[in-house]
Each structure stands twice: as C-alpha cells, then as structure tokens.
A protein has these predicted regions:
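Acidic, Ser/Thr- and proline-rich intrinsically disordered linker/docking segments
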Residues: 2-4, 26-28, 39-163
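Broad, structure-driven detector of short, well-ordered beta-strand segments within folded domains
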Residues: 29-33
C-alpha cells in the first residue's frame, strides 16, 4: 500500500473460501478496498472489542442499505499499513485480478475473485457473515444479502489489463 492511498470500502466479518476442488473450510477477515489495491486481512492488530462492535453496526447498516462501499470508524490507512506487514494478509494490485464477479445465492451474496499472486493462480469466493457458530470450529451460519456491484465496478474501472 502506498502512503497516498485512501480506503474506499471496508467490510468486516467476511468469510473467504477457496473454490479449488477438495478445499475445506475458510477464513474470516476484512476486505479493504483502496484507490489501487484490494486486501484481505485476517491477521489484524485491531482489538476484539472494536471488531465486535463494528460487525454489529455493519449488520444494521446492511439491513438499511445493501451498498458495500462503506467505511468503518476506528480503522484507517495507518492501521491497514500495519496489518499488511503480516505476510499472511493478502494485498492485490487491481491488475493481479484476472476475474471478478458477484452472484446472488439463496443463502446470500457472493463476490467471486480469481487472481495470480507469486506465480500461483487462486480462486476464492467471499461472503459477508451475519451469524456465527463458534464450536467446534468458528463458521458462519447466516450470510448477508448485499450489493457487490459498486465494489466490483470500482475495481473493473481501475484495472489496466495487459494480458
């Protein structure tokens, strides 16, 4: 992330699952959209108390409006830079993304993403969780119906595809 970048959208309680054959489970994290990057942060320095409050606010926000281009108080560009120091978090330049789309499922709205990172082709789906079961493993039990269109369009409008 560059120092002049600004956060354009910040989504929490995002469940990411691989679309590869035989993949099991997923990861919870944040999708953060900046001027030039899409990041998936699942190792954050943010406090648990903040996370719990902001996920509840996000659910209320999505009940009122389905728009995914939202930003949450309490997390800024400097915190994103700090989180991206952890190499487990993923930062994509828009041109790394070979395919981006969204789909409405019966159970919720899904963002589908294909990209190449470190010479490896990856394919994931992302959905925003509303409720969770915590035992025996943390997993979503209910997903939100949201409008991924402005989020996807923001990325598509800024890509310079050279392939």
């Amino acid at each position: 992330m560059q120092s002049d970048e600004k956060i354009q959208a910040h989504l929490v309680s995002v469940w990411r699952e691989s679309k590869k054959f035989f993949s099991i489970g997923g990861k919870e994290g944040m999708l953060v959209l900046t001027d030039k990057h899409l990041t998936f942060v699942y190792k954050t320095e943010s406090r648990m108390k903040w996370w719990k409050a902001v996920t509840q606010r996000q659910v209320i926000n999505f009940i009122k409006s389905k728009n995914t281009m939202i930003i949450h108080d309490g997390y800024n560009e400097q915190e994103l830079i700090n989180d991206l120091e952890n190499k487990k978090n993923i930062e994509l330049v828009f041109d790394d993304i070979s395919k981006i789309s969204y789909e409405e499922k019966v159970w919720g709205s899904v963002l589908e993403l294909e990209y190449e990172k470190y010479g490896k082709q990856e394919k994931f789906q992302y959905a925003i969780a509303q409720d969770w079961v915590k035992y025996p493993v943390k997993e979503p039990t209910k997903y939100m119906k949201v409008d991924w269109k402005p989020f996807v369009q923001y990325i598509k409008d800024r890509r310079i595809l050279t392939k």
